[in-house]
């Protein structure tokens, strides 16, 4: 499971001119599910992201989590995070999970974050989405449950 996590001051997802999810201060999480992912990966990613200390404390040191600052998560499924661009010019998505599996694990990630007392808004799985955000910092982190990087 792979995520791009951005600290944002606000963000929203729009599908067919309707807002499907919107937050103020928090994290925008683009989540890609691999064909090898399990509930263990879901658990790892949810706990890592909810407790990731990338918000500044009073001394302007990154020392607070989204939970600590009372923020929310805006979760967006994005299979293109699994694109392999090492060969040729067209990405290969062979490592991405099948849609039915990816949807199940994406929803499980959201549920796990909510079990950790974080409010989660979301995009629409497999929809063409317009994602609007104001990146705070900017602060952007890459997280992989297999610890590839």
Swiss-Prot record:
GO molecular function list: D-tyrosyl-tRNA(Tyr) deacylase activity; Gly-tRNA(Ala) deacylase activity; Ser(Gly)-tRNA(Ala) hydrolase activity; tRNA binding
Gene Ontology annotations for the cellular component aspect, listed alphabetically: cytoplasm
Annotated keywords: Cytoplasm, Hydrolase, RNA-binding, tRNA-binding
Record bears the keyword tRNA processing: no
Gene3D superfamilies linked to this entry: D-tyrosyl-tRNA(Tyr) deacylase
CDD domains referenced in this protein's UniProt entry, alphabetically: Dtyr_deacylase
Broad EC category: hydrolase
Reactions accelerated catalytically: glycyl-tRNA(Ala) + H2O = tRNA(Ala) + glycine + H(+); a D-aminoacyl-tRNA + H2O = a tRNA + a D-alpha-amino acid + H(+)
Family annotation (InterPro entries): Daa-tRNA_deacyls_DTD, DTD-like_sf
GO biological process, one term: D-amino acid catabolic process
Localization per record: Cytoplasm
Pfam families hit by this protein: Tyr_Deacylase (PF02580)
UniProt short sequence motif Gly-cisPro motif, important for rejection of L-amino acids, positions renumbered to this chain: 137-138
Enzyme Commission designation: 3.1.1.96
Assembly and oligomerization: Homodimer.
Family assignment from sequence similarity: Belongs to the DTD family.
UniProt free text on domains: A Gly-cisPro motif from one monomer fits into the active site of the other monomer to allow specific chiral rejection of L-amino acids.
Function of the protein: An aminoacyl-tRNA editing enzyme that deacylates mischarged D-aminoacyl-tRNAs. Also deacylates mischarged glycyl-tRNA(Ala), protecting cells against glycine mischarging by AlaRS. Acts via tRNA-based rather than protein-based catalysis; rejects L-amino acids rather than detecting D-amino acids in the active site. By recycling D-aminoacyl-tRNA to D-amino acids and free tRNA molecules, this enzyme counteracts the toxicity associated with the formation of D-aminoacyl-tRNA entities in vivo and helps enforce protein L-homochirality.
Protein's recorded name: D-aminoacyl-tRNA deacylase
């Amino acid at each position: 499971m792979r995520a791009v996590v951005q600290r944002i001051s606000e963000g929203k997802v729009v599908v067919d001119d309707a807002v499907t999810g919107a937050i103020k201060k928090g994290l925008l999480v683009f989540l890609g599910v691999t064909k090898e992912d399990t509930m263990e990966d879901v658990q790892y990613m949810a706990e890592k992201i909810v407790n990731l200390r990338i918000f500044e404390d009073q001394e302007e040191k990154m020392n607070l989590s989204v939970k600590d600052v009372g923020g929310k998560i805006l979760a967006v499924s994005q299979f293109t995070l699994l694109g392999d661009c090492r060969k040729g010019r067209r990405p290969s998505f062979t490592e991405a999970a099948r849609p039915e599996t990816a949807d199940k694990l994406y929803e499980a990630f959201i549920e796990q974050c909510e079990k950790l007392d974080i409010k989660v808004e979301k995009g629409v799985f497999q929809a063409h989405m317009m994602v609007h955000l104001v990146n705070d910092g900017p602060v952007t982190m890459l997280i992989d449950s297999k610890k590839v990087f």
